[in-house]
Amino acid sequence: MVCLPCIFLPIMMAIYMKFIMPYVYRVLPQRWVNFLDPILYPTCPVKIPEPENKKEVEEEKKDAPCCANTTEATVETVETKKDQ
């Protein structure tokens, strides 16, 4: 049998977050809301590392003509279809 808190607490938490919390946040000062948000809604502190050669990749994207690779691929597929 499931204990009462295992059923009661999630239901009450959902009701609070859906209906009561929006009204409470309107009354609280913005400074308190900014303080409480990271506590109530924690996020992962791990940062994704950026690539070391990010500038080189961006320059290559800028220098490459638009759709250059797709036209070559379509020509190759048309030629292979003709050969078969």
From Swiss-Prot:
It is a single-pass membrane protein. It is found in: Cell membrane. One of its GO terms (cellular component) is plasma membrane. The chain crosses the membrane at residues 1-21. InterPro entries: UPF0729_C18orf32-like. The keyword Transmembrane helix applies. Keywords: Cell membrane, Membrane, Transmembrane, Transmembrane helix. Belongs to the UPF0729 family. This is UPF0729 protein F18A11.3. It comes from Caenorhabditis elegans.
